[in-house]
């Protein structure tokens, strides 16, 4: 199994796919959401992975990557991504991030813009947004009642939001993925204490061509997508109809078309 060994000693698991009929071109890195892993990109492997060199990486504490005691804040994830790209000798790349991965991707674009060819933010949250206030309740549960209780609370809360009842197969996939995730993130003694500067006033500093995607039923993220659309200088926004939070799984064909067209336009 391929792992990238970071200078910190943490190993990140990843899977890489090369296009069948063309040169590899500029690679694409995919970042998954919280309590998920590379498997959430299943339908992108089938389509985007055939057109572009595509790398799907598990964040630490997720999937098959290592689970250190601490170091799960956004700034830490940004540095992990830099080290990961250096290990794979990726001088410049496209970056697609979903939810937590979108936050990481935005942080990376603000810190290391020279490494990015394009930026795609899917159902991505803005740091310090009011959305995170309810997450702090889970941090309290983790500290007072234990990581296992917090993970179950997250699962019970998020499943109806991630996968509505009518999307039975998506729901099964999501449930299993969340159940499979380690408890390390919840056990982090610094959980809830990482400081991340508000993104709102920094969005104008994003110099990378950006594509913002959200599902029309994902109201709070549609709101954040509107803020990004207003403030990021070079940006396009797509609101996917009949979709909630899990756009890449709920509307894979439409998502793939939008992502591929954006990758093609920004690869020149």
Model-predicted regions and their roles:
Residues 10-70:
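Conserved HGGG/HGGXW glycine-rich cap/lid loop of the alpha/beta-hydrolase fold
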Residues 76-93:
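Conserved acidic catalytic loop of the alpha/beta-hydrolase fold
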Residues 106-111, 116-147:
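Flexible "cap/lid" loop of the alpha/beta hydrolase fold
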Residues 130-132, 147-204:
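Conserved alpha/beta-hydrolase catalytic His-Asp/Glu region
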Residues 235-268:
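Catalytic active-site module of serine/aspartate enzymes centered on a nucleophile-bearing elbow/loop
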């Amino acid at each position: 199994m391929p792992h990238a060994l970071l200078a910190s000693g943490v190993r990140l698991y990843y899977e890489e796919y090369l296009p069948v009929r063309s040169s590899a071109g500029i690679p694409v890195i995919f970042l998954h959401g919280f309590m998920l892993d590379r498997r959430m990109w299943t339908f992108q492997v089938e389509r985007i992975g055939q057109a572009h060199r595509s790398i799907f990486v598990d964040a630490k504490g997720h999937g098959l990557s290592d689970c250190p005691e601490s170091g799960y804040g956004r700034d830490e994830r940004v540095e992990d991504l830099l080290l990961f790209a250096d290990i794979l000798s990726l001088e410049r790349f496209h970056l697609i991030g979903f939810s937590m991965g979108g936050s990481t991707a935005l942080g990376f674009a603000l810190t290391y813009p020279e490494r990015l060819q394009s930026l795609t933010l899917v159902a991505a949250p803005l740091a310090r947004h009011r959305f995170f206030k309810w997450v702090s309740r889970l941090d309290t549960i983790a500290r007072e009642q234990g990581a296992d209780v917090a993970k179950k609370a997250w699962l019970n809360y998020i499943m109806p939001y991630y996968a509505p009842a009518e999307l039975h197969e998506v729901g099964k996939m999501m449930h299993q993925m969340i159940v499979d995730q380690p408890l390390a993130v919840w056990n982090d003694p610094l959980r809830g204490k990482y400081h991340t500067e508000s993104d709102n006033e920094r969005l104008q500093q994003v110099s990378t061509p950006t594509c913002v995607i959200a599902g029309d039923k994902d109201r709070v993220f549609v709101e954040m997508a509107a803020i990004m659309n207003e403030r990021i200088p070079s940006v396009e926004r797509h609101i996917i109809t009949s979709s909630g939070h899990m756009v890449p799984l709920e509307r894979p064909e439409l998502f793939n078309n939008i992502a591929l067209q954006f990758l093609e336009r920004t690869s020149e």
